[in-house]
A protein has these predicted regions:
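Conserved ABC ATPase "signature" region
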Residues: 66-90
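Helix-to-loop junction immediately C-terminal to a conserved catalytic motif
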Residues: 2
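Catalytic Walker B motif of ABC-type/P-loop ATPase nucleotide-binding domains
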Residues: 120-123
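Conserved ABC transporter NBD signature motif
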Residues: 10-18, 30
Length: 218
């Protein structure tokens, strides 16, 4: 979906385009409209948080502006604003190497929010956070998607978080879709089938993934 790899079969369409039918330049322009939220954000250890957040706009800035931003952050108020939404405003000028895993994940989310994309693809975005913080962060992401007409697709291990925050749940196992239902339609039987031969008691943040897309424009 991020148009990083061509599909081995079939077609992928995102934002009305089939990425691998576009030219390289057109595909790069498409990628600027998509934000990736990584489980382990690829942030240089010595890079300051403010620079990491502002990097969300690198795909939209020219080379000169991007290089200048490395020397002197160009939008400190903008970075501070998104960090404050994630309770990280006090880390604005802290090197990334001084942050915990959960804090790094929130910096990655702040960068995606600052990018202001049309689509956000999140891979285990809250796996390093405690339950309260994970719940708060997913609520913030979903609210942002609703208010800004952004499509949010998240891959989550935590079934209870997926059911609590996303209206549509896709259960995937061994590369196959087992069900595609609204959250209210997902039953214990569906989960038992999805997790056959695996222990499923009280869901925790270490369970097998469920994919939960949020598409407010549909």
């Amino acid at each position: 979906m991020a148009s990083a790899l061509p599909p081995s079969a079939g077609q992928v369409e995102i934002l009305g385009s089939s990425p691998w039918q576009l030219s390289g330049r057109q595909r790069q322009q498409l990628r600027r409209r998509i934000a990736l939220i990584h489980q382990a954000p690829p942030l240089p250890p010595r890079q300051r948080v403010v620079t990491a957040v502002l990097a969300g706009k690198l795909g939209q800035w020219g080379l000169g502006k991007s290089l200048l931003n490395l020397l002197h952050p160009l939008d400190v108020p903008g970075a501070r604003d998104v960090l404050s939404r994630l309770d990280l405003a006090d880390k604005l000028f802290v090197p990334c190497q001084q942050l915990s895993g959960g804090q790094l994940q929130r910096v990655g989310i702040a960068r995606a929010l600052y990018q202001a994309p049309e689509v956000m693809l999140a891979d285990e975005p809250v796996s390093a956070m405690d339950p309260r913080l994970a719940d708060h962060t997913l609520a913030l992401l979903c609210q942002h998607a609703i208010e800004n007409g952004v499509t949010l697709v998240a891959s989550l291990h935590a079934v209870e978080l997926a059911l609590a925050h996303f209206p549509r749940i896709i259960g995937v196992r061994d590369g196959q879709i087992h069900f595609d239902l609204s959250a209210s339609e997902v039953s214990r039987e569906h989960l038992d089938t999805l997790y056959a031969n695996e222990q499923l008691s009280t869901p925790t943040t270490t369970e097998t993934p469920a994919t939960a897309p949020w598409t407010p424009r549909c």
